[in-house]
Amino acid sequence: MPFEQPLTAAPTSATPFRTSRPLRTGDVAPDNRLRFDGIARYLQDIASDNADAAGFGATDPVWILRRTVIDVHTPAAFPDRLHLSRWYSAYSTRWSNMRVQLTSDKGARIETEGFWINLNSDTGMPTRISDSTLELLATTTDESRLKWKAWLDQAAPAADGLPDAAFPLRSTDLDPLGHVNNAAYLHAVEEHVTARPDLLAAPHRLVIEYRAPITAGEHLALRRRDDDESSTMWFVVNGESRATARMARL
């Protein structure tokens, strides 16, 4: 099944983009574990740094995430210093899989992959990646026919009399497009995964897929279902699932 498929290894014929930074207290839980929303912010930071260093921030400035995969093999904990490596693992003419590996001075290892879509800044629709950026993507992968395939069930299950959990939005949850920021979704995930210490205690995978944006003023509810091996959350607005997240052991 797609959810279980392994992430690609780092390239051997090219050097990934690399950066490092201290693990900050604003990104950790009370037990000093690096939270999922903190991971998301580091992924956003290295994406911006990579775009600036490579120059495609000028030619292809607007990208959105369709999916994020986070594999926590060994969690990071404060205090520590994180080392991030970013490379391109597959692409097509309008989107790309971006891999980021997080390691640390104290032995943390977190592997991630994001499915990024290039948008036209005027229309907000998917658009062709510039030739110069396509050339850059090809430096770390030969896979140039990437297609979208969902890993998670997008439709939320029936309520079945079980209460949803309201998750009020804040103005600080919104990005420049007026959409709920990727990291803010993972604030909601953090609210619920702490109820599954059995999953957090083992190496685990979190996948979140974004179906449609959530905007200011909308009433967001989380619908959660658990089994022995996983926890799944649907982000529901007016009865419609806008995103799905699932966490399970690796």
Feature annotation, model-predicted:
Residues 2-7, 12-14, 69-153, 210-217, ...:
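HotDog/MaoC-like acyl-thioester-processing domains
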Residues 2-66, 113-115, 119-204:
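Hot-dog-fold acyl-thioester-processing enzymes
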Residues 165-249:
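Acidic/His-leaning functional-site neighborhoods
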